[in-house]
């Protein structure tokens, strides 16, 4: 078959905060950078990040520094973060937010003109920089404009299907132009995978429609290693009603500004679960507390709890929480006068492509940045660390990808692999009968929410793993579409996305089944305590034939050598 080949030095897959920052950095290093995204450019999930960006600037609390940021991140991550990556994050986050200001981002200020910082969950000091409650939107708009200023070529509405690997090194990616249905090959000397998360594998989620786990699946099939995939964050506060809004994010900034959680009995229940941090305990702790209140009959009739800011000054709410004010006004709730109803919602993948400090994976020439990578956040991500992650490791990935591109020749494309992938992609269109993907997608979301959610058990995880493996091996090859059109065929793209969702969900379920303890966001009702003797480890996933191989690896530590260490006992060198 014939196909179009597009050449670049550095190819970035994904156009969110991490991907665009990587492309900007590569272009600044004078290489030809290109971006491929399945959405319209500028419409990435990053714009939905509302609360803020963590950086130890000490503008509000003068005692803050990178060491406290490091400590809070590792404690918040249930001690299994890759500490080499955490050190990079906390030391470079301040410089990267200054980059954003230079690009044009407008951040809230203190009365003396410095970047303002607010409290966020499980943090010792106020270090979350913000732009009202629209921080991600502000940052993304700035990054998009900088990308355009540098004249970086962007291929939007192009769906990446498989990474191309030649003799152990990256060679590019195969893709479909959604607008035309044409099969394309993007060849590159280096590739940055920045394709975002997989929240859409869950029935209730904050995530955009595009967050279907494409990057996790592509990485696995290419032979890359993934880490911490059992660690899925459920944000404590998503909207409960109306049904069309269920799961939409209610930013942690609401609690950071003083919002209070209470149950149907008007009890401030976080006193029972986290008496010191209360509403600003870790997201894993608050999500489990809310879920337990509902399960034990102390929730609202709609299945949530109340989040109240009506005790705060109306002017403060209008200034610092304008998006939340508008979001709830649309459903008839004035948060200045009455409480919101909230419940947990699928939010963030802590696990993903295993990278080192240079953002390199185990595949030569494949770099990673943003939510598709793992190791930085460990067992639970702190609110505000995600945006910092996108900028710190987006820059590192773009910079190191450019350095590689400057010293290697253009790779060879395996024509047999490309033609085989084209047959797989178009095969679904050519099939005359089989299984419709949309019913399987509904079943997948319900399965993951019910059996691989906030509370997990061995029996349910085994059932989920078995079902997902069966779907992957027996159902995927039988997908049948009603529409045979190649141009803007949403059913076709959803079928291809569903393949990625199923393999990603299977990885999550199998890693969760293997980890026989509770740690961070991973809670096993049959193993409700942490087990540092046996499970102070990371779980690494790699494809083995038609199966998924899992193994334990020691946690990479630098300053904090064992769980439970106090800040004062850490030897900061």
State the predicted function of each range:
Residues 1, 6-8, 17, 22-25, ...:
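Glycine- and aromatic-enriched mobile tails/lids
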Residues 55-89:
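Glycine-rich active-site loop/strand segments that organize a redox cofactor
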Residues 31-37, 228:
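Short beta-strand "acidic-cap" motif of Rossmann-like dinucleotide-binding folds
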Residues 188-190, 194-199, 372-373:
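Glycine-/small-residue-rich beta->alpha transition segments that form the dinucleotide
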Residues 99-182, 187, 194, 238-241, ...:
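Conserved redox-cofactor binding core of oxidoreductases
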Residues 81-94, 127-145, 155, 205-213, ...:
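Short beta-strand to alpha-helix junction loop
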Residues 41, 218, 224-334, 338, ...:
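An anion/pyrophosphate-binding glycine-rich loop and adjacent beta-alpha core
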Residues 5-8, 180-190, 362:
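Core beta-strand elements of the Rossmann-like FAD/NAD(P) dinucleotide-binding domain
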